[in-house]
A protein has these predicted regions:
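Positively charged, low-complexity intrinsically disordered leader regions
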Residues: 41-88
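Divalent-metal (Mg2+/Mn2+/Ca2+)-assisted nucleotide/phosphate chemistry catalytic cores
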Residues: 65, 145-268, 275
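N-terminal catalytic cores of NTP/NDP-binding nucleotidyl/phosphoryl-transfer enzymes
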Residues: 74-136, 240-246, 252
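Active-site-proximal loop->helix
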Residues: 131-146, 161
Length: 449
């Protein structure tokens, strides 16, 4: 393959100088060495002194991160950007594997917004092509690939929801099918030659599956390469991802060197713990807060986290400055009720995804429920079968997932009818209209016949 044929697979951008033309006659053994020499040019440049504004930008970038690799390189990127006036290109790729985002997803989006507010170009990359492969990160089994129709359906809501965090007008939206589809078989083989199977198997999840004899499909081995190639196509200066994405992000650095680009730095964000404070936030674990959740429910769920976990949520989700957070901690240590600080966090999160008034209203609703009051907007339903056992009643009212769970709630004094606590698991509820309550947040107005 001639040298110039490597250039066309980078979409919409062709970087050809006079020096590149002279490489056309070189054999393939010579080219990688020449390529990598391009990528090291920046390392030969004298280090720039970091201005106060660059150091401030670096501090904002590092807030709450798990790793910033390589920090000294990124500091120099920031300094060169300030000197040249050319913003850095910041990349975040998301495969639209599910149609809705939760607060755990917004951890990395918040970091993108911080970098966006520093004046850099943020690229919201929708992995419509890689979704058809299925990211194996953190998996002990092959992730099912999505159909094109599923991907399109999920992608429709992705950016709309992400825009609740990002400034949509200043965000570049790209789809990796732009450059992955044109690759074809020849381009895919060429890309695959850039990395060895041994190196890909260094990934912890692949290593575990290989040792356990769990099948690893060939297409899964391609995923890190495809994600890395996205960085080549976009000429990314920094790529963001979760801690489970570190291997894939590092592949991007190596591929950029092979294509003669300055390698991107990588920034990994920690995975946000869910409401239980133990497992990572996940829909499958039921410990999540959806960003499309009603304001009152969102507020109440934030208030349910522990006082210790509150600081973690502040660090990863709040737009408040580090100085403000430090002051909050001083006040709590001096005796201020942590509930006050948690209320401020809950209102901030509700205001971001709804509006400020919704935050005030959610607080009023939460306080009313805490005093034993009944919300105004509770669901109403009609049921039959009176007299009906309390366990069946709670299940049919969708206030408990099962009769066994319902009876446990009765044992724990967590069930009320018209405000009166129920302690009899054998209770048969007669016909009538009444308010049924489970815990502090679940209500239903029942007409039983």
């Amino acid at each position: 393959m001639q040298w110039l044929k490597e250039v066309w697979i980078i979409p919409n951008q062709i970087w050809i100088s006079a020096s590149i033309y002279c490489f056309k006659s070189m054999n393939s053994d010579q080219k990688p060495k020449i390529n990598k020499s391009f990528a090291t040019l920046s390392s030969r440049q004298p280090a720039l002194t970091l201005s106060d504004s660059v150091q401030h930008a670096l501090a904002i970038t590092k807030r709450g991160v798990d790793e910033l690799l390589i920090e000294s390189e990124f500091a120099q990127k920031l300094a060169r950007s300030e000197l040249s006036g050319i913003p850095l290109r910041i990349k975040l790729g998301l495969d639209p594997t599910a149609p809705d985002l939760h607060l755990g997803h917004t951890v990395v989006l918040n970091k993108m917004r911080q970098l966006q507010d520093l004046g850099h170009t943020v690229i919201f990359l929708i992995g419509d092509f890689t979704s058809m492969i299925g990211d194996p990160s953190g998996r002990n089994i092959t992730r099912p690939a999505l159909t094109k129709e599923q991907i399109e359906d999920n992608a429709r809501t992705y950016f709309a929801q992400a825009s609740l965090v990002l400034d949509a007008e200043r965000t570049e939206i790209r789809y990796n099918s732009e450059w992955c589809d044109p690759l074809g078989a020849r381009g895919m083989i060429e890309l695959s030659s850039k990395y060895t199977v041994a190196r890909i198997l260094e990934r912890e999840d692949f290593t575990k599956r290989f040792k356990a004899g769990t099948p690893i499909s060939v297409h899964e081995l391609l995923y890190p390469l495809m994600q890395g190639y996205d960085s080549v196509a976009l000429r990314a200066d920094l790529e963001l991802g979760g801690t489970d994405q570190k291997f894939n992000l590092l592949v991007g650095r190596e591929l950029q060197k092979d294509w003669g680009q300055e390698p991107q730095c990588i920034l990994t964000m920690p995975l946000l713990e869910g409401l239980d404070g133990i497992e990572k936030m996940s829909k499958s674990k039921g410990n999540y807060i959806s960003i499309t959740e009603p304001a009152n429910g969102m507020f109440a769920k934030v208030m349910s986290i522990s006082d210790v976990m509150m600081w973690r949520y502040y660090e990863l989700l709040s737009a408040r400055s580090l100085a403000e957070l430090a002051q909050f901690k001083i006040e709590v240590a001096a005796g201020r009720n942590p509930r006050d600080i948690k209320v401020a966090l809950a209102q901030e999160i509700v205001a971001r995804f709804h509006n400020q008034q919704a935050g005030f209203d959610a607080l009023a609703d939460f306080d009313n429920r805490a005093r034993g009051g009944i919300p105004d907007d509770i669901p109403e339903m009609q049921l039959s079968g009176a007299p009906l056992g309390i366990g069946q009643l709670l299940k049919q009212a969708n206030l408990c997932a099962s009769t066994s769970e319902a009876l446990r709630m009765v044992e724990q004094n967590g069930v009320r009818i018209d405000g009166a606590a129920i302690s009899d698991k054998a209770l048969k509820v007669e016909a009538g209209t009444f308010v049924l309550q489970v815990g502090k947040r679940k209500f239903a107005r029942i007409t039983l016949s």
